[in-house]
């Protein structure tokens, strides 16, 4: 018996096609011209925990070993170079750009473990090796203590032609129909921001807005209490469709939990009664309440060693992880680094006037200061490349970065106007009307509101790569160095003199 049944197969429509992003290797032609660039010795000095101000004026900046250093490298415009080879490129049909081939970030100063802490740190009880049951975490006393430790060990080197993107947890907007109370836990959300020079990195206390979400100012070290600690958003930068924010990166993070303790304060989300059996009140205890479950650790980065250094070594860029294979659009490079393995804090001590002529004295006769210093040097190997000014390339570049076309001084000529306009001859005389004010020049820099360490290499390029350390490494690695062959010496020719025979008579 035949029975008709409706089909059970499901039909799936093909997904909509996505816009294809071409790789820079498809429209950027590389030449055999290379340049070497190097910065000066870059130094910075400041207080390791906070900046010192006097009446709104900053006297000493904050220079912490746990801060990001973001260098904005400005390169010269290769289209303004005077090349001896006229066949290198056609300025009517092509434009020149820089491509990054090698980089080396050198760090000075000796290795040293940085120390961070807080003189009023929220440490209540030792829960690692407890000797007594403390359940008075919510009383009226102040249990804060002065505590210091070494942070998580972080080394990071990241570079691209746009700034790196960071992520952190911040307070979210609260719902208007159900407003929370002041003591309720605020909603939080993950936000993305640009990593700027001087931002704090994550050192074991989470990537979050500590200033907004921790009102006690005692949950983290001093350098984080009024700051935002950011973590690079590797997931988002790896999915960047143009691949400009991260050509490649090298990182090393290391941490272990050194000590375990609990925090004091009211426990609004205490342990539910069904999760434990009610305890018996012991002698000397004010109540039989359960202790707080607000646990915390003190991080430690452990040993610093020269065997595990990310810096002071050369990196060669053969193939970037994104679609941008090292092309430095707008003639700039952003280098983002973190290195707290050279986090030694210098202690400076001066004598008071009463102690200058004495050999012994009390501590009140001395004044102490804290400073942290950092030393950098950046080296680059750049390759000269060219882009054809085809309509397809210009359309794509304009949709990606409109400033590229503007910097190349490519514009469409305006159509002639059909109206008659007035043009006065003597604009500066009192006989004619005042000339209209010139509009202020608009700052077209898209990063004018961000803070970076500006490094200008416009006059620090050289094509003599064999005269510099990184250049010689590149020549040896790439096989571009001319190897001279010694011409073999001619074989010696032996001349045998024949002896003349005397003629017999």
Swiss-Prot record:
Keywords, in A-Z order: Capsid protein, Disulfide bond, Host nucleus, Host-virus interaction, Late protein, T=7 icosahedral capsid protein, Viral attachment to host cell, Viral penetration into host cytoplasm, Virion, Virus endocytosis by host, Virus entry into host cell
Database matches in SUPFAM superfamilies: Group I dsDNA viruses
GO molecular function: structural molecule activity
Domain of life: Viruses
Principal subcellular localization: virion
GO annotation terms (biological process): endocytosis involved in viral entry into host cell; virion attachment to host cell
Region (Disordered): 479-505
Pfam families found in the cross-reference section: Late_protein_L1
Xref: InterPro entries: Capsid_L1_Papillomavir (IPR002210), Capsid_L1_sf_Papillomavir (IPR036973), dsDNA_vir_gr_I_capsid (IPR011222)
Subcellular location: Virion; Host nucleus
GO CC annotations on file: host cell nucleus; T=7 icosahedral viral capsid
Assigned protein family: Belongs to the papillomaviridae L1 protein family.
Subunit: Self-assembles into homopentamers. The capsid has an icosahedral symmetry and consists of 72 capsomers, with each capsomer being a pentamer of L1. Interacts with the minor capsid protein L2; this interaction is necessary for viral genome encapsidation. Interacts with protein E2; this interaction enhances E2-dependent replication and transcription activation.
Record function comment: Forms an icosahedral capsid with a T=7 symmetry and a 50 nm diameter. The capsid is composed of 72 pentamers linked to each other by disulfide bonds and associated with L2 proteins. Binds to heparan sulfate proteoglycans on cell surface of basal layer keratinocytes to provide initial virion attachment. This binding mediates a conformational change in the virus capsid that facilitates efficient infection. The virion enters the host cell via endocytosis. During virus trafficking, L1 protein dissociates from the viral DNA and the genomic DNA is released to the host nucleus.
Name of the protein described by the UniProt record: Major capsid protein L1
Organism of origin: Cottontail rabbit papillomavirus (strain Kansas) (CRPV)
């Amino acid at each position: 018996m035949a029975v008709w049944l409706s089909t059970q197969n499901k039909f799936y429509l093909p997904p909509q096609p996505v816009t294809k992003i071409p790789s820079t290797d498809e429209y950027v032609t590389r030449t055999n011209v290379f340049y070497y660039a190097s910065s000066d010795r870059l130094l910075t000095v400041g207080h390791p925990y906070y900046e010192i101000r006097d009446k709104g004026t900053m006297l000493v900046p904050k220079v912490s070993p746990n801060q990001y250093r973001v260098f904005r490298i400005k390169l010269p415009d290769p289209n303004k170079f005077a090349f001896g080879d006229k066949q290198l490129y056609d300025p009517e049909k092509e434009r020149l750009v820089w491509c990054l081939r090698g980089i080396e970030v050198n760090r000075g100063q000796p290795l040293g473990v940085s120390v961070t802490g807080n003189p009023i740190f929220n440490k209540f009880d030792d829960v690692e090796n407890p000797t007594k049951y403390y359940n008075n975490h919510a009383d009226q006393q102040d249990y804060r203590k002065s505590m210091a430790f070494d942070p998580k060990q972080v080394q990071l080197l990241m570079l691209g032609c746009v700034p790196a993107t960071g992520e952190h947890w911040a307070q979210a907007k609260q719902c208007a129909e159900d407003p929370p109370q002041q003591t309720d836990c605020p909603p939080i959300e993950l936000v993305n921001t640009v990593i700027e020079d001087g931002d704090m990195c994550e050192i074991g206390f989470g990537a979050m807005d500590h200033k907004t979400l921790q009102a006690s100012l005692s949950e983290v070290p001093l350098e984080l209490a009024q700051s935002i600690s950011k973590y690079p958003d590797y997931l988002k930068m790896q999915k960047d469709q143009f691949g400009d924010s991260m050509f490649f990166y090298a990182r090393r993070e290391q941490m272990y939990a050194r000590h375990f303790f609990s925090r004091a304060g009211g426990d609004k989300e205490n342990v539910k009664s069904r999760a434990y059996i009610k305890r018996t009140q012991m002698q000397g205890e004010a109540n039989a309440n359960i202790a707080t479950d607000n646990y915390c650790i003190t991080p430690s980065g452990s040993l610093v060693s020269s065997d595990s250094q990310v810096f002071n070594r050369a990196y060669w860029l053969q193939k970037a992880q994104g679609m941008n294979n090292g092309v430095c659009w707008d003639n700039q490079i952003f280098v983002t680094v973190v290195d707290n393995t050279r986090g030694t804090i210098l202690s400076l001590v001066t004598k008071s006037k009463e102690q200058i002529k004495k050999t012994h004295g009390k501590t009140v006769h001395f004044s102490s200061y804290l400073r942290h210093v950092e030393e950098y040097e950046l080296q680059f190997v750049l390759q000269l490349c060219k882009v054809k000014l085809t309509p397809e390339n210009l359309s794509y570049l304009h949709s990606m970065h409109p400033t590229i076309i503007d910097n190349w001084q490519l514009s469409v000529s305006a159509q002639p106007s059909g109206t008659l306009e007035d043009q006065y001859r003597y604009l500066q005389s009192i006989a004619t009307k005042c000339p209209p004010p010139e509009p202020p020049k608009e700052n077209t820099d898209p990063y004018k509101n961000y803070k970076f360490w500006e490094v200008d290499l416009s006059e620090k390029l050289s094509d003599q790569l064999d005269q510099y350390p990184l250049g010689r490494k590149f020549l040896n690695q790439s096989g571009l160095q001319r190897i001279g062959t010694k011409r073999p010496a001619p074989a010696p020719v032996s001349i045998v003199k024949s002896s003349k025979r005397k003629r017999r008579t």
